[in-house]
Amino acid sequence: MFSDLRKKFVFLTMSILIVVVLFLFAVSNRYNQYWDEYDAYRIVKLVAKNDYLGIPGDEPIALVTIDNQKMVKIQSNNTDLTNDVIEKSSLKLLEQGKKSRKWKSFIYSIKEYKDKTYTIAIMDLASYEVPYARRFLILVFTIFGFCLLAAVSLYLSRFIVGPVETEMTREKQFVSDASHELKTPIAAIRANVQVLEQQIPGNRYLDHVVSETKRMEFLIEDLLNLSRLDEKRSKVNFKKLNLSVLCQEVLLTYESLAYEEEKCLNDTIEDDVWIVGEESQIKQILIILLDNAIRHSLSKSAIQFSLKQARRKAILTISNPSAIYSKEVMDNLFERFYQAKDDHADSLSFGLGLSIAKAIVERHKGRIRAYQEKDQLRLEVQLPIDGFWTNTMIN
């Protein structure tokens, strides 16, 4: 978890940095391009005015004259272009007019005489391209710089994420220790109350205490399960499983429970859908989702359970009629101890069940999501099928 958080920090930092650098590079490049063109135009204007290529250096300039018959004569050519290209380009430039100063890769200046003859100075900006070796060197240094910054960001991320990691580790340890410490007194309370029930049968207060101690025991067990799931180094027993058979076994148990609640449980299960996972945890996912669907579906409604294989994944879907929940409720269904604050769901509370299901699914490299279609609440679980896993995916 924290390793992924550090990677996200580095990715975000480098993304922002790259965007800023590219923006500055684009602005700088446009600024330099403008002044390069300005300097080039100043030079060609001077050459055309003096009718003489007396500019020091190796500027790629061609000087041509055009008579009143549109005959082109090349006075000098210090570019990489052939004379034929210069002649044709000169006539094209003349058509552009004196007011223009750029055409394609050419910067030019035209001087017109009274006898309708012209002198044109042309500079080829393409010859100003940075040499290949220099461009390659710039690219190498840029890549090296970004790699260095990425390494520094990764190193610094340890100091940024470290305090959060320490605090969350302490919190998990506290939950685990507190849950273990509570198990014994809760069990003692329940045992004593059961003895009292035998001595004082039919006492509703004692019945209520027994009910609440059972609920506390379930809650403590859920907290311990979450603590174990959060600990990635805990041992797991992954093996090849027939998910179709597991679904049928769990459904058989819950059909009677659904009947007692006056609800119908319909299933569509594709045969021989194989996955790799821990059997007890996969069953726990099914139990949590079915229990959630039965408890939160509308009275006398039908719950749909389906399992199929598609896109190299086992797709498990449970849907049930429900109230229309707000986006806030749907976005927080998998949060621990989430209590809905919704007009249609004043008493809606999912406890730890869906949080545990999400943790198990993610441990199996899968994905779980909740969404609504009209009046149907759907929970969908996607797990990699057998054959798609690699040894490195099994922690």
Swiss-Prot record:
SUPFAM superfamilies assigned to the protein according to its UniProt record, in alphabetical order: ATPase domain of HSP90 chaperone/DNA topoisomerase II/histidine kinase, Homodimeric domain of signal transducing histidine kinase
Protein name: Sensor protein DltS
Catalytic activity of the protein: ATP + protein L-histidine = ADP + protein N-phospho-L-histidine
EC number, UniProt record: 2.7.13.3
PROSITE patterns: HIS_KIN
Function: Member of the two-component regulatory system DltS/DltR. Regulates the expression of the dlt operon. Probably phosphorylates DltR.
Keywords from the UniProt entry: ATP-binding, Cell membrane, Kinase, Membrane, Nucleotide-binding, Phosphoprotein, Transferase, Transmembrane, Transmembrane helix, Two-component regulatory system
Keyword Electron transport in record: no
Name of one Pfam family that matches: HisKA
Modified residues (Phosphohistidine): H180
Main location: membrane
InterPro entries linked to this entry: 2-comp_sensor_kinase (IPR050351), HATPase_C_sf (IPR036890), His_kinase_dom (IPR005467), HisK_dim/P_dom (IPR003661), HisK_dim/P_sf (IPR036097)
Membrane-crossing residue ranges in chain numbering: 9-29, 136-156
Lipid bilayer topology: Multi-pass membrane protein
GO terms for biological process, alphabetical: cellular response to phosphate starvation
One GO CC annotation: plasma membrane
Subcellular location: Cell membrane
The Histidine kinase domain, residue ranges: 177-387
EC class (word): transferase
GO molecular function: ATP binding; phosphoprotein phosphatase activity; phosphorelay sensor kinase activity
